[in-house]
Amino acid sequence: TGSAFNQLDDPQSPLSVRIIYFEYDSSEIRSDYRSTIEAHALYLQQNPNTSIILEGHADERGSREYNLALGERRAKTVKQQMLLLGANSNQIRLVSYGEERPASDGHDDASWQQNRRVEILY
């Protein structure tokens, strides 16, 4: 394996996937993202001086307050999973933007799907 820098920048690495998408009104991790979360948790475990920010997001449906809480629940769920897999709590910061920072500005299912997410920032 190369240096940490190479691992994070390698498009073939599972670490290149930095967005976890969620179903409507859900903070449950979809099974197709478990291996992504596992890879990031392992990376954090192997690199104890590395830290990340988990940004929780929601689509525009629902109140602003509700969506901030939903974004936070999503980020917390990803953090809990990473902790169970060996990451350290002090390596992970959480922030929720709710509906404030959409990945897509549309007002349809395809856009909303892109906005229901947690982004992993190194």
Question: PLM features: residue spans?
Answer:
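Periplasmic peptidoglycan-binding/tethering modules of Gram-negative envelope proteins
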Residues: 1-51
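A generic structural micro-feature
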Residues: 110-114
